[in-house]
Amino acid sequence: MSATSEVFGGSSRVFVAEAVSLPTAIITAGFLARRFGPDDYGLFTLTVAIVAWLEWTLTSLFARAAVKHIADAHVADADDWRPAGGMVLRVFAITGMLGLFVLWVASPSLGALMHEPSLSRHLRLLALDVPLFMVTQAHQQVMIGTGQYGRRATVAAWRWMGRMVLMLALVSAGFGVDGALAGIVGASVVELAVARSFVKPRVGDARRGNASAMWSYAVPLFAAAVSLRLFDRLDLFMLKGLGAGAAIAGIYGAAQNLTIVPGLIALSVTTLLLSTLSRAIRLGDDAGARSLVHNALRGVLLLFPFAGVAAGASTGLATLIFGARFAPTGALLSVLIFGAIAVVVISVASALLTAAGKATWALIAALPIVPLAVAGHLLVIPRYGASGAAVVTMTVAAVGAVLALVAVRRAWHMWPAIGTILRATLATTVAIVVGSRWTTSGAMVFVELAVLSTMVILLLIVTGELTPRERQLALSRLGRSRPLSFRTK
């Protein structure tokens, strides 16, 4: 199997499993938005955003270094991942407990900063999720580093299904916002149990692990990871901190929640890309490695036309899911979706640079975005509010994406094909223009999304971007994905 096929096959399995979050998240978000109203939904969104930001920040500090460390050990000896896995488990567990402590102590101050006194109680409840989340992530890095993509996909599917069931059940029972947060914690317990049934790294094995090998990658990636995580949800935090009410935060948070697909793609692809590319380089498969880099760059550009589809149908989609009171969410979504795709470009570029041994070059794209975003939000939010925050986020993310591509060009001497750029631009423009002139509501929104997506795919085929072999590969891989099954190859 080629390196590109391995990544496509593995990431398609993980994406299909993570894509379970789409219907579950839409059902859950729509239920909670109608049940809570803009004010309580805004408070819920703010709580989840803060804790999720902390969890993914802590994970991103070590995830790529952990995958590369385990993948290198696995290539050297298929059974030699246990010391590396034990080291990863110990680091993630300690970090999770520290995160719980910091969030517990800081919650009153965060409530005061956001002008929401009740936020402190909600944060302390959801803080219990941090160590559970981190330990589960350690198990997932082991699965990815050892090539167990199907099992990684199964774990993801259980998480999203468990979260939806528990949240809806507890809120329906009358537990309100606290019930929804408790459902998230309960889903993490389920996810950890499933992950543990597949792989069992032990902290005791870490004594035999080579800690310096992991830290050699973790340290240079630390600053880049912190910067990217600070950028994530920075717009929502600054919007609220600069005086926006809970209702505005709820509307803005709803728009952010609808940008979930790019995040799923980044989650599905980047660590698998790093694992496979690292193995190809270590095995001396230079041709396979370069082909994989080329296809990774091409793939992220082809996400933009589908962002255009979402932008064109944004208002109808927002009102269908959240209700008429969330109609302003549509305009915000049409901007934020492109910023989310730009962040995927940065994430993929970071994986390519890390695999090439140029982890410090990831700083080129990551470091400038936070100060640029802070300056932009301070200038724009007081005058333009939520719409200004969305534009600043998209613009800064685009700058970071360009810088990331420049760094990849220096490391791999490769640049996205001009033809791909032009065809992606054409398809994106057509999707936006047609979608903006086609007004739908209710169930017809799904018809609009299907028609626009089909139109984009046909455009890419007609213009020669997608070859018959690529279409066949995509259909075969997706057809073989079984994310809910415990049986894996």
What is the meaning of each model-derived region?
Residues 9-26, 180-187, 191, 195, ...:
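Transmembrane helical elements of multi-pass membrane transporters/channels
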Residues 1-7, 177-178, 193-233, 272, ...:
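Interhelical loop/hinge segments that connect adjacent transmembrane helices in multipass membrane
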Residues 86-114, 165, 169, 173, ...:
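Alpha-helical transmembrane segments of multi-pass membrane transport and lipid-handling proteins
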Residues 5-64, 91-104, 219-242, 449:
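Signature of the first transmembrane helix
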Residues 124, 153-201, 217, 367-375, ...:
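Hydrophobic alpha-helical transmembrane segments
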Residues 436-489:
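Membrane-proximal transmembrane or re-entrant/amphipathic helices at the cytosolic face
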